[in-house]
């Protein structure tokens, strides 16, 4: 079985990644999507039938990671394939540095 994603987008900024995740156990797709929606820095854009999915051109200047096109990965027993995009200057560098620092300060203060 094969799960494939092909994307051709000429952009100056922002990264896109096709990510495959394999779980140890079976999972419920709706529950997985609900859990992603609960995460503060993740925005779920996942309705391919209505052409709603993350594009690099939409995320420039934003801190969040945008996730979509979530589907079962049939090349493994319990897996998914998803498309993620983020502003690589903000999420890949500046915002991540601030978030890491906040976590370290929080741990030091016992939060």
Question: Which residues fall in each region the model found?
Answer:
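C-terminal substrate-binding/catalytic lobe of Rossmann-fold NAD(P)-dependent oxidoreductases
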Residues: 1-81
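NAD(P)-dependent Rossmann-like dehydrogenase/reductase catalytic/cofactor-binding core
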Residues: 64-66, 71-111
């Amino acid at each position: 079985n094969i799960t494939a994603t092909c994307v051709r987008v000429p952009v100056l900024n922002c990264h896109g990644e096709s990510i495959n995740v394999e779980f140890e156990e079976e999972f419920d797709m709706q529950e997985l999507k609900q859990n992603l929606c609960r995460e503060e820095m993740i925005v779920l854009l996942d309705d391919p039938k209505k052409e709603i999915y993350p594009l690099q051109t939409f995320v420039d200047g934003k801190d969040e990671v945008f996730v979509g096109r979530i589907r079962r990965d049939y090349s493994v027993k319990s897996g998914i394939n998803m498309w993620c995009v983020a502003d690589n200057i903000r999420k890949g560098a500046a915002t991540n540095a601030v978030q890491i620092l906040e976590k370290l300060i929080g741990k030091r203060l016992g939060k």
